[in-house]
Amino acid sequence: MPSGGGVMYYDGTYYWFGENKCDTTSSAMVGVMCYSSRNLTDWKNEGVALSVVDNDSSDIARGCILERPKVIYNAKTGKFVMWFHLELKGKGYAAARAGVAVSDTPAGPYRFIRSGRVNAGKLPVNMDGQAVAVLDTLNAKNYEKWWTPEWTDAVNKGLIVKRDLDGGQMSRDMTLYVDEDGKAYHIYSSEENLTLQIAELSDDYLSHTGNYVRVAPA
C-alpha cells in the first residue's frame, strides 16, 4: 500500500484505502484497493474498491494518475463517499483534479461520479474586499518569472487564485474531515502546491458548496 492512503473506522472495523501501483509505472492500472481490520494488526484484502476502466474517454481511464483516496461515511444518506486526487491519462500533473465516487458499503465497489477542479468562479470567503481589490490589480504577464520576491508576494495576494478562478482551483494532495455537526470538508494543496485550501462539501458530500478558505499561502 503506497503512502497517501486513508483509514476509515466504521462499525467496529478499520478500512484502509490506497493506490494500487506496480514497480514499472506510477499510473493507475488497477484502481483503489481496500483492506480491513478489527485490531490494526491483522488485515484482510477486500479487493478493488474503485476500478479504473478500459475507456480512454473516461476520467479514470486505465493509465490515469489516481492518488490519496479518502473515504467518509454520510450518516444522512447512508452512503460511503470517496474523494481522491486525479490526473488525466497522458497529461502528467497538469489536471490537478478532485474525483469523487460513492458506494453503499465500506469496501465498495465504488461508482465513479465525476472529477474536476474545485469551486470554479468562487473566491475564498476569507478574502475581504480590500484583498479582492488588490487581486484585481494583479496581471500574470507582470510575473512570468517564478520564485522572485515579487512573484512570491503576488502569489500570497492571490495571483494563482485569480488565474484559476474560471476553471476552478487546483487540488492535489488531500484529505477529508467530518466535524461533530456532520459537516464535511475537503482539505487539499492548491495553487501549484504553494497553499492549502479548505472547502466545504455539500450535505451529501458529493460536491462543493462554493465556500472555501486559503490557509498559509507561500
Model-assigned labels for residue ranges:
Residues M1-A218:
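Carbohydrate-active catalytic/glycan-binding domains of CAZyme proteins
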